[in-house]
Amino acid sequence: SNPIKDIIVWSIHLGPYPYGPYEICFAGVTDSTELVLIDSLSGRLPQINSLVSTMTQYIANADSIPIFVGGDFNTPSHQDYTAATASDHCGSTYQWPVTQVLTDIGMIDAFREIHLDPGMDPGNTWSPIYEINSDNNLPEPQDRINLIFYKGQNITNLTCDVSTGNGEVN
């Protein structure tokens, strides 16, 4: 087999607010139509759709030149909010649309590919250092919002883990 010589990488930081899990946990929003609107108002859904539009030619050629998208999505993965994990997410099983956009075009969530069970291995990246949300004095929603997706032949995902620090950086 030929070694991979080139890859294409996009690093992203999608709009942070309004943050959907806050709307669910602190404002009691449960309507999926309203949650889609929140993702649109934050800019996340338009931003990921714009990225996918930019990526179109590269997606078609990903088997020759693999593509990666990674960064701070500021939204949970649709693969993490399941019936089995609802109690960890304020009762929600909402299917977050931003990550769904990437899997719909054949991209693979690198973490969830290795760690299949979101209940056993949530991979939370927001926010393991904050237990209480200071604005609401309620438990901080714990979610995996920093993600890596990839697409291409001859890519073998050997491991993908979360590393967290011991507190705030000054």
For each of these PLM feature ranges, what is it?
Residues L35-D63:
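A long, amphipathic alpha-helix that forms part
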Residues L14, D72-F73:
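Active-site metal-binding loops of divalent metal-dependent hydrolases
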Residues G20-S42, A84:
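A solvent-exposed, charged loop/short amphipathic helix patch at secondary-structure junctions
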Residues Q57-F68, N74-N170:
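Metal-dependent phosphoester-hydrolase catalytic domains
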Residues S1-I24, L158-V169:
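Structured beta-strand-rich core segments of catalytic domains in phosphoester-bond hydrolases
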